């Protein structure tokens, strides 16, 4: 395990070091001086800064952060400084900005709940280039609230959940039945294939076929550029990703124009485009809608399939939890079969232990390790000053693995959620506040449906696989399991 991790981290770290040095040198010096100058000459303000260090000249502490991020324990960067400074809130210098890092649940909650009068989103330049200025991840104020509210309400609607449930069942049943006994099923690959097509249908109304396959290929070309070198010259990774986005945008904007041309308001809306064009606001342009449809496809390629895959991995390593989840799902299937009824989305979400498994997977897996915000004014919280222009890194992972908040935090223990309070800010896998992930209910539903069909269809033996944590969480081999079909009376 150690040698495999080292084999992955060494070349990746070398590349990261070169990239950071080449791209950030001049900008880092400028920002560093600006950040370090905050509160200059003001001893009282300086005293209120969190403890910490800006690290090395030019690169700050970025190289050590990246090195830890590629390791099996990314939180080591934060844990080391918590012990050194005696505080879960400390200052650092990461990716070109003076940064306050918080692994304190109360401070993290404060930042997440704050609006654009205190903090605005901050992302790497390559990501902002690809997302576009009208992305829900980047816009602020009333427009952000409107788009988030419209999309969030649609994602919570019974209509979409019913459609998604039927689509998942229709795609999963033949997909799983195609695996003969003793064959190898790669959970991550299957989950991506199923979830992407279903979510795209819910977003833009596109059905399976040639255009769906082209969109999938272009999206895969697009997504690999999100954490790339921010250079747009022909042939570079970012350039190729931008070209892929243009092709996707042309397809989506054609769909938008067709919908606008024939539109009498669909009731209920069939997809997210229907919802946004039905609002009637001049601010919701075709470009804004297409940008956000592409952004909302990211969970289908990344976070939801990884949630499913990690759940299978953790269950495979915890036979007692797997057995209880199997029993719960088999009982539901038998009960609905005896009643002559098809499972509805409410049935899947009623499976309490399955929901505990998903919650624990989100806590332990930390698919989203944290988020960054930038202070637009001086902000003070719990006696710590966050100067205007500084970034704040809200590190979910350290909070989720804090042994003062969770007993045996590195142990997969779904039973802890029978009594655990999730309202105190110590559990934030989907972010929070006005930027809370609008698709959190759909992510849980998709994972519940996938797990139900998997555990009621197969027994399996998992092959060894390892979690890669950076730049995104994934399983190195795609989580291969060797499956055996269950008999109907099992």
Curated annotation (Swiss-Prot):
Molecular function terms, GO-annotated: heme binding; iron ion binding; oxidoreductase activity, acting on paired donors, with incorporation or reduction of molecular oxygen, NAD(P)H as one donor, and incorporation of one atom of oxygen
GO biological process: brassinosteroid biosynthetic process; brassinosteroid homeostasis
Alphabetized UniProt keyword annotations: Brassinosteroid biosynthesis, Heme, Iron, Lipid biosynthesis, Lipid metabolism, Membrane, Metal-binding, Monooxygenase, Oxidoreductase, Steroid biosynthesis, Transmembrane, Transmembrane helix
Location of this chain's protein in the cell: Membrane
EC assignment: 1.14.19.-
SUPFAM superfamilies named among the record's database cross-references: Cytochrome P450 (SSF48264)
Mutant phenotype after disruption: Plants show abnormalities in growth: inhibition of second internode elongation, shortened leaf sheaths, erect leaves, and deficiency in skotomorphogenesis. Treatment with exogenous brassinolide (BL) rescues the abnormal phenotype.
Biochemical pathway: Plant hormone biosynthesis; brassinosteroid biosynthesis
Reactions it catalyzes: 6-deoxoteasterone + reduced [NADPH--hemoprotein reductase] + O2 = 3-dehydro-6-deoxoteasterone + oxidized [NADPH--hemoprotein reductase] + 2 H2O + H(+)
Conditions for induction: Down-regulated by brassinolide (BL) in ebisu dwarf (d2) mutant.
Superkingdom of the organism of origin: Eukaryota
Binding-site residues for heme, renumbered to this chain: 437
Main location: membrane
Family per similarity comment: Belongs to the cytochrome P450 family.
UniProt-recorded name of the protein: Cytochrome P450 90D2
Species assigned in the record: Oryza sativa subsp. japonica
Lineage summary: Eukaryota, Viridiplantae, Streptophyta, Embryophyta, Tracheophyta
């Amino acid at each position: 395990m150690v040698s495999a991790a080292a084999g992955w981290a060494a070349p990746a770290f070398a590349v990261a070091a070169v990239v950071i040095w080449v791209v950030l040198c001049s900008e880092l010096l400028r920002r560093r001086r600006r950040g370090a100058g905050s509160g200059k000459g003001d001893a009282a303000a300086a005293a209120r800064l969190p403890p910490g260090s800006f690290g090395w000249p030019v690169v700050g502490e970025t190289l050590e952060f990246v090195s830890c991020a590629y390791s099996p324990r990314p939180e080591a960067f934060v844990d080391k400084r918590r012990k050194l400074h005696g505080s879960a809130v400390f200052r650092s210098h990461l990716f070109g900005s003076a940064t306050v890092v918080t692994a304190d649940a109360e401070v993290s909650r404060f930042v997440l709940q704050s609006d654009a009068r205190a903090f605005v989103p901050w992302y790497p330049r390559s990501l902002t280039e690809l997302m576009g200025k009208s992305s829900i991840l980047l816009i602020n104020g009333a427009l952000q609230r409107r788009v988030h509210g419209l999309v969030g309400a649609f994602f919570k609607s019974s209509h979409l959940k019913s459609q998604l449930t039927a689509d998942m069942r229709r795609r999963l049943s033949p997909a799983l039945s195609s695996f003969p006994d003793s064959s190898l099923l790669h959970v991550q690959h299957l989950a991506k294939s199923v979830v992407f097509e279903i979510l795209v249908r819910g977003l833009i109304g596109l059905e399976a076929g040639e255009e769906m396959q082209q969109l999938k290929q272009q999206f895969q070309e697009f997504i690999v550029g999100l954490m790339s070198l921010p250079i747009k010259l022909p042939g570079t990774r970012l350039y190729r990703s931008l070209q892929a986005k243009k092709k996707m945008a042309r397809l989506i904007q054609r769909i938008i124009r067709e919908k606008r041309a024939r539109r009498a308001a669909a009731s209920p809306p069939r997809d997210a485009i229907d919802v946004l064009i039905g609002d009637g606001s001049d601010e919701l342009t075709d470009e804004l809608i297409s940008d956000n449809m592409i952004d909302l496809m990211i969970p289908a390629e990344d976070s939801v399939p990884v949630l499913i895959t990690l759940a299978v991995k953790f269950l495979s390593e915890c036979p007692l939890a797997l057995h209880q989840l199997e029993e719960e799902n088999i009982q539901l299937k038998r009960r609905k079969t005896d009643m002559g009824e098809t499972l509805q989305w409410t049935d899947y979400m009623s499976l309490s232990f399955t929901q505990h498994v998903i919650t624990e997977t989100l806590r332990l897996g930390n698919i989203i390790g944290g988020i960054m915000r930038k202070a637009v004014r001086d902000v003070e919280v719990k006696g710590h000053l966050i100067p205007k222009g500084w970034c704040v890194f809200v590190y979910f992972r350290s909070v989720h693995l804090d042994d003062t908040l969770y007993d045996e935090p590195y142990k997969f223990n779904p039973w802890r959620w029978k009594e655990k309070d999730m309202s105190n800010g110590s559990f934030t896998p989907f972010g929070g506040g006005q930027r809370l992930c609008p698709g959190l209910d759909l992510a849980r539903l998709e994972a519940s449906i996938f797990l139900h069909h998997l555990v009621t269809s197969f027994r399996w033996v998992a092959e060894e696989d390892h979690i890669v944590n950076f730049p995104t969480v994934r399983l190195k081999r795609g989580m291969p399991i060797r499956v055996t079909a269950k008999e109907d009376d099992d």
